[in-house]
Design a protein with these regions (language model features):
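Cysteine-nucleophile amide-bond enzymes
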Residues: 1-244
Length: 244
């Protein structure tokens, strides 16, 4: 039975990862500018072009379907041409893997940077993610995979739960959950729940960490604690020098 479930799961995962033909990014990345500004601890959001990307974008009502963490060159991980792997990501059917930055040059991307995070904590965040390379996605969990095959539409109040449904095993991680857990390791907020102390003498906001499995790629975009870094203007921009 286990072999059969695993086979069915792999077939579903393969179907979900197939690219949708005709994808053209509205605003493609500028590779050289991106490579020149990205720093360890930055979160790279991606507008994907496979079947699961379209479903995630619908469920999250967002442009972004995937997130990867930039950690800098990883020892022993490189492309055949020598380009180092610098990203950690979790993909359905693959689990937690590393990748070169060039993987996402053809895509529409956004760079999100944690504000005020110390060098030591950045290092901890990156090391947390690197140590999880090899964590898998359990293709035997058909229910977990089938959530992406549910006919649309899905009521709005269920959409975030649809992303997290079936999760629970700490070694089976989706992309945004992996990154959320890495920042949780240093208690850096993304989109915490906020409550207010009842006492008048203690009027202050109290932040509560959300379940990491409920995070979506777009949460890094809308988080008040992450800066949006636009590579083409970060070092200055002269609109008069443009020819258009």
């Amino acid at each position: 039975m286990g072999v059969m479930l695993d086979t069915i799961g792999q077939l579903i995962a393969g179907y979900l990862q197939k690219e949708v033909p005709g994808y053209e990014p509205f605003t493609p990345s500028d590779p050289e500018h991106l490579r020149g500004v990205v720093e360890p601890g930055d979160v790279l959001l991606v507008e994907g072009n496979n079947r699961i990307s379209g479903i995630i974008k619908y469920l999250t009502q967002s442009t972004w379907s995937h997130a990867a963490l930039y950690v800098g060159p990883i020892d022993g991980a490189a492309e055949p041409d020598g380009e180092p792997h610098v990203l950690i990501e979790a993909n359905i059917g693959e689990g937690v893997t590393s990748a070169p930055l060039s993987k996402y040059f053809p895509y529409h991307t956004r760079l999100c940077r944690p504000v005020g995070l110390s060098y030591e904590d950045r290092t901890t965040v990156c090391r947390y993610a690197i140590n999880r390379i090899g964590f898998g996605y359990d293709t035997k969990n058909i229910v977990d995979l089938a959530r992406y095959l549910v006919p649309l539409p899905v009521p709005q109040r269920w959409r975030r739960r649809m992303i997290a449904f079936g999760s629970g095993d700490p070694t089976k991680i989706i992309c945004s959950a992996l990154i959320a857990q890495a920042f949780d390791a240093v208690r850096y907020p993304i989109l915490p729940k906020i409550t207010r102390a009842a006492s008048r003498k203690a009027r202050r906001e109290i932040l509560h960490i959300r379940d990491s499995s409920l995070y979506m790629p777009r949460d890094f975009d809308i988080s008040p604690y992450f800066e949006i870094v636009k590579p083409t203007i970060v070092h200055g921009f002269d609109y008069l020098s443009l020819h258009w």
